[in-house]
Amino acid sequence: MADTMQFDLVSPERNLVSVPVREVRLPGADGDLTAMPGHAPAIVNLRPGLVTVVAGDGSETEFAVTGGFAEINNESVTLLAERGHPRAEMTQEVFNEMMAQARRRVEAAKERESAGEELVAAAVKLLADMEALGTHIGLDPNHANFPH
């Protein structure tokens, strides 16, 4: 079995990273998971959270994602994120924009007469996951600059 696997993280705005890694820790919609070389093939839905990339030398790099999905196989992980930023770029301003978008999704879901409870619940869960992400990385999910 190889010591590393290929990891690619892509968002609509840009290709964030393409590197060989020892492991990738992902915020799966059904729970966190770690992909390593030799992993069984899987497609995983992601919730907002941190993706941690562990290089061959053990150094770690984190990326904040707002959701998406990952394709995992025995020699690579390809993550397609709705939005993604290196943790170092996650300023309060960037996080405020992400939270405002999540709040708009909740309001839009509530306003649709035909929206089922599942759609509203999914939007509310997205907002809660975004708040948890911000708290985890030291950003204020209740910052006063949010448009309500």
Curated annotation (Swiss-Prot):
What InterPro entries does the record point to?
ATP_synth_F1_dsu/esu (IPR001469), ATP_synth_F1_dsu/esu_N (IPR020546), ATPsynth_dsu/esu_N (IPR036771)
| Molecular-function annotations in GO | ATP binding; proton-transporting ATP synthase activity, rotational mechanism
Keyword Protease annotated: no
One matching Pfam family: ATP-synt_DE_N
Might you report a single GO cellular component term?
plasma membrane
Keywords, A to Z, come to:
ATP synthesis, Cell inner membrane, Cell membrane, CF(1), Hydrogen ion transport, Ion transport, Membrane, Transport
Mainly resides where?
Answer: membrane
Per the record, membrane topology reads:
Peripheral membrane protein
> Where is this gene product found?
Cell inner membrane
Report the record's disulfide bonds: none
Check the UniProt entry and state the signal peptide residues, or none. Answer: none
CDD domains found in the cross-reference section: F1-ATPase_delta
Q: Which family is this sequence assigned to?
A: Belongs to the ATPase epsilon chain family.
- Job of this protein: Produces ATP from ADP in the presence of a proton gradient across the membrane.
Q: What's the subunit arrangement here?
A: F-type ATPases have 2 components, CF(1) - the catalytic core - and CF(0) - the membrane proton channel. CF(1) has five subunits: alpha(3), beta(3), gamma(1), delta(1), epsilon(1). CF(0) has three main subunits: a, b and c.
Q: What is this protein called?
A: ATP synthase epsilon chain
Organism source for this protein? Paracoccus denitrificans (strain Pd 1222)
Q: State the taxonomy lineage.
A: Bacteria, Pseudomonadati, Pseudomonadota, Alphaproteobacteria, Rhodobacterales
